[in-house]
Amino acid sequence: MALSPMMQQYLRIHDAYPDCLLLFRLGDFYELFFEDAKTASRELELTLTGKDCGLEERAPMCGVPFHSVNTYIEKLIEKGYKVAICEQMEDPALAKGLVERDVVRVITAGTVTDPTMLEDKVNNFLMCVFLDGKHAGIAWTDVSTGEFYVMEPEISLLGAQIARIQPMEVICNDAAALISVVGNGVRGLSGQPQAWFQRKNAEETLCSHFRLTQMTSLGLEDRKYAACAAGAMLKYLLETQKNSLEHIRSLRFAENGRTMLLDQNTRRNLELTESLRGDRKKGTLLGLIDKTSTAMGGRLLRSWVEQPLLDPEEISRRLDAVEELVKDRVLGMTLSEELEGVYDMERLMNKVAYRNMNARDCLALCASLKRIPGIRGLLLNVQSGEMTRIREELDPLEELTGLLDRAINPDAPVVITEGGIIREGYSAVLDEYREAQTSGKQWILDLESREREATGIRNLRIQYNKVFGYYIEVTRSFLGQVPDRYIRKQTLTNAERFMTPELKEVEQKIIGAQEQSVRLELQLFTEIRERIAERIDSIQRTAQALKKLDVFQSLSRTASENRYVRPLISTDGSLSITEGRHPVVEQNLKDGEFIPNDTLLDCGENRMMIITGPNMAGKSTYMRQVALICLMAQIGSFVPAKEASLPVCDRIFTRVGASDDLASGQSTFMVEMSETAHILRNATRNSLIILDEIGRGTSTFDGLSIAWAVVEYIADREKIGAKTLFATHYHELSELEGHLEGVKNYCISVKEHGEDVLFLRKIIRGGADKSFGVHVARLAGVPHPVIVRAHEIQARLEVSDINQNKIGQNILGEESVNRKNEQVDLFEYKKDEIIQEIQQIDVMAITPMDAMNKLFLLKEKARKI
């Protein structure tokens, strides 16, 4: 037995896409067969059936309706699969023999463009990595917006760049080599043909796509590694997307020294775009400052937060724009309101390129462009360079707006093949077809009235459906009155359906006019879509200007609402913050509850702050706020402080907290040391370093020794000499002030009253003389006997001059003496517990039965003491 022709067609197409699940169009369904069917039925919870395929056994099969296929594709992509969409390339009704089919697109995690499958304010990047020995080139694009970037990072920083960009999919010329360089954490990694990465082939692909004769126009003639990555990525897109990608109009070379590289630990510890609890909005810096009105602006602001600037002049230009809107809040708020009417123009251009833009998308584009004249008018008197450039780059595209206004029906349906999308008056021919339909339908109504009168059949009706066309329906009770000229067409349970030659003739005219109308509408709409495609460049430039304007209004609004100030960019490398605040933490407190703090770090005698004090006192919050203030300034934002003069930091490093890395088998201490080593290898004197509790993952003396050595290494100008905030429980490190140049002691101010301790959250000069750790344990709810015992051991250690190895012996030597006292303490604790319970009883509210039960329980507790 042989496979059926259709199954042979299926397997032939599937063989060309062996790494994909093939969705094979059959009528109104997409079907999957054989192993693909088994996989899809398991992952999508679909019923697995079978289909005759010409063999003895039926082929495993499952399918999904064409109108809901995107829901299923999204689930498969989320689970890591690639999906090939195989469509019918001709009308099955007109096909002679087997319907021609072909793959029209391959959808992968990095090539998703459907807005329902994407987050509005998050880019969906595909990345291509080219490795050549000790050199690397990377390219990344968001196919849904047309953004395209290339870079040649140092091989040692490749992993950090991948972590910064966070691509959903990575392709490369050597997957094994990439894993050896950056580890196993690369999402959606796959190797691609080496030929794509060869320089000659890559340059040909680039020149062909951008319609160039030479590479100099792209600025990549001396950047061969980036060119190889960019060309290979374009080849991958052309192979999978099956279209010309005309919305990808340019590429930008990302200079290594233009923006700050934030490693994964810093982004996580500072909770820039995701909180430590995994929340993407609440508790993050981005969630606080994102008051953008458009999806485009939201994506741009996210990229600014993840890529702080390193050029003081560029930072100042952004700050000028923000300041202009802070000073004119009416302008800022009005711009925000205008921008709310702007749709995601970047992703609309993707729809133009993919030729799946519908009439409602056209209306969205038209509505967005109509906002431009008003926005330009609002910017008429702006003075800052950035705002002036934005005004100049805004193009209202009045000709295109006028076309869309005249052509598109405001109530157009989503589907473009069913008519109703072109406005009346746009096409005289189309209006004639519509008039023919309208007059024909009126003729049908008149005929219905005439036939009722002629036959005496009161409930005679003329109706229409897609299968039988127009027909006369008569119920069985009136069949005796049906005239001979009626031609029976269909018999139903309670009625008969008939046709007349006259009705048939009019039906053909109406349906003919309707078909011609739909066909002409589709043709007209296609022409309109092509007119939009011709203006992609102008639309994208306008979108770029709008999203930047949106970010500026968002930053100005955040600054105004939270009393932020414009930071000064210091030229001497000093860092001075007066009454600085943590931007996120203060939002969770009532106005005035957050305690602000000053900070002074410079390149001389105040390079490093050794900060001592107990947990829960505010050390970590303080250090993070300093880092966040510096980062906010470098994205062009005002900062939460009374005054701030800040240097441009080339890197911000943080090592805060640690836990076991179970996936890689690393202990807490190993993770801590790896992170510390990374900082010591990469920090420079222009960096800002935040270190919290170095050395706590090992023994006391080992930890102290490591922490001491790290402080010495960072403080040494010949080695690093960076501005550093170093929090520690090792009070011995306070001795370094006066012995190491640039080191100063600070602590958290504490107020003691008897056994009670109040943390004042204020950073003051000097070292802490107590840790208050046992007090923190009591606040955390540790049982009273443990607290009592901890105080005893603490007192013993404080008066003993012993080394670490003899601590245990010293404590245990007292065990027999203290055991009796410990029992007395336990008795006192139990007695106090009973007294406390009695005091908490509400005598006026308790019922007699509850009182007896409570008395019984208290008696039992007293008996057990």
Predicted ranges, named:
Residues I315-R318, E338, V342, A436, ...:
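Intracellular alpha-helical coupling/juxtamembrane segments of multi-pass membrane proteins
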Residues A37-E56, T141-P167, G480-I511, D591-L601, ...:
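Extended active-site and interfacial segments that coordinate phosphate-rich ligands
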Residues M1-E324, M333, E337-A353, M357-S449, ...:
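Charged catalytic and DNA/RNA-contacting regions of genome-maintenance
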Residues C86, A109-L118, S244, V382-E386, ...:
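Active-site phosphate-binding and catalytic loops of NTP-dependent enzymes
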Residues Q198-E204, M260-Q264, L276, A367-Q442, ...:
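Amphipathic heptad-repeat alpha-helical coiled-coil/stalk segments that mediate oligomerization
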Residues F34-A37, R223, S293-T294, L301-W304, ...:
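ATPase nucleotide-binding head domains, primarily ABC-like/P-loop NTPase cores
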Residues P167-N173, E502-R535, F638-A641, S645:
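Conserved catalytic alpha/beta cores of large enzymes that bind or transform nucleotide phosphates
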